[in-house]
Amino acid sequence: MVLPPPDRRHVCLTTLVIMGSMAVMDAYLVEQNQGPRKIGVCIIVLVGDVCFLLVLRYVAVWVGAEVRTAKRGYAMILWFLYIFVLEIKLYFIFQNYKAARRGAADPVARKALTLLLSVCVPGLFLLLVALDRMEYVRTFRKREDLRGRLFWVALDLLDLLDMQANLWEPPRTGLPLWAEGLTFFYCYMLLLVLPCVALSEVSMQGEHIAPQKMMLYPVLSLATVNVVAVLARAANMALFRDSRVSAIFVGKNVVALATKACTFLEYRRQVRDFPPPALALELQPPPSQRNSVPPPPPLHGPPVRPHGPSPTRDALDT
């Protein structure tokens, strides 16, 4: 498939978010080391950033070229590459904070690191989806329904980042070593995979996107984020007496469990009661893409009714 010319604003904004967050992470890594080791770390991160920038120079242009299409394949590649490198740097920052003496590290710097991740990671995901560039999503109701589903993805990303932030924000955590490693790499894996699942659902739907049919991500999110996060936070409070557990995100997970359960029940009812003619009508292209000239009526037969939007089509075009 030949891609259209890239959207320069989208390419510049995506590159700015990625390289800006990477530069701040590099500053944390360099600042955490002293003496001759600081020079070595500085050289390593500079070489890594140059290699990453060479790859980003091509992938970001491909992402900007496909942003006006219904495909998001290059967006998934860029997301995977970004999170893979970002989390490696974050792991070393976390280990440096853990090795520091109690109270030696600035708590404001730890909060600033969490704030940076909370803005850049969900923000980059929404940039890669580029809902405002989807010109084929014409109806306001369908666009807002899709925006609401993407907002749930952003909330899940914030939930995972909050679980990771509980490892480095307090000066000293009460979790054992195996629990810290399990928590970090579990969130790492979900940050890599779940947004790619959401992007693949958007890509597979094509131009005739139907948000009510995008059920793979809600199922995975319900099992891997909402259920596991509630159990993990409850175990931290009950077993390890961890007072840093976010009660707000526990409430978010409970609300998400109830909301998604209702969504699944409603979806099953709609699939069971959906009439086949209405389903076929929903899969047809919009009236604006059809031939506006009606076919000539037969010589011997009833007159052909004029073409126009049907009530069923209006009800299903959400």
UniProtKB/Swiss-Prot annotation:
Topology in membrane: Multi-pass membrane protein
Keyword Transcription: no
Name of the molecule in the record: Transmembrane protein 121
Biased composition (Pro residues): 278-309
GO CC term, one of those recorded: membrane
Function recorded in the entry: May play a role in MAPK signaling.
Pfam families from the UniProt entry: CECR6_TMEM121 (PF14997)
Compartment annotation: Membrane
Keyword vocabulary terms for this entry: Membrane, Transmembrane, Transmembrane helix
Keyword Transmembrane helix (UniProt): yes
Region (Disordered) residue spans: 278-318
InterPro entries, per database record: CECR6/TMEM121, TMEM121
TM segment ranges: 10-30, 43-63, 74-94, 112-132, 174-194, 214-234
Similarity field: Belongs to the TMEM121 family.
